[in-house]
Amino acid sequence: VYFARNIAVAWIFLEATTLCAAGIVYHRRTAQALEAAWKYVFVCSTGIAMAYLGILLLAAATDCESLDYATVAAAAPGGSALYLKTAFLLILCGYSCKAELFPLYTVGVDANFAAPAPASALISTGLVNAGFLALLRVYKLLAATEVFPWVKSVLLLVGVLSLVVGALFLRRTNNYKRFLSYSTVENMGIAAIGLGIGGIGVWAAVFHVVCHTLIKSSLFLQIAVVRQVYGNYRINRIGDYIHINRVGAVGLLTGMVVLVAFPPSPLFLSELMILKQTIA
């Protein structure tokens, strides 16, 4: 996905990640893990099918014999506006299950909860980034078209919805793993807002995703240690963790401070850049 130069090749490898991720979600072989794995396969396959229809419409709109990114980007300005808009909507909705954006974000949250912590770290970073990159490349394809302002507006709306939904569920959950999963939805919403704003917001969005990857993976791995100590992921049960694992508790606290974008953390800097571009 990261190195593909062709839209169809990127789509194939994103579909492959669905099958690979389902296996690690079912690692514990419990009824809950089985349900989450099947849900992940079904919803992601539905999303990927929607993205495939979007790619077909994109090919029809540009009348390209090749789906190489460079070829499609060169032909996109002459494409039908209706086809391009419909194609982008389908691709955005389809890949939202991978990028953990509204509307198909729920499947990633459930998969993270059922999977072992290292697998959750992979899903919330590597797979989410793959979905984000696929959307970013389509975003770049349409940059020279007449529908690009509309594309940015849609991304801005999706970003705001993802941010709001993630923030609302963050307040309601008492489970550390779900807390981190909804935090991913919130942070990917911020990245989508950066793309929707454009300009320096695009670079801020990429920087935000990279920093989120480093922080979130470390937090999921530390949560695995917490579960070994307490046997669960309940937030209100780990108040004395600093007396049991001082180094781990400091690392967990530091990661949470960075995750909530407390200045001068890198996530604060990326959000500040997006805010400055918004009011510019």
List the predicted regions and their residue ranges.
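Hydrophobic transmembrane alpha-helices and their helix-loop junctions in integral membrane proteins
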Residues: 1-8, 20-280
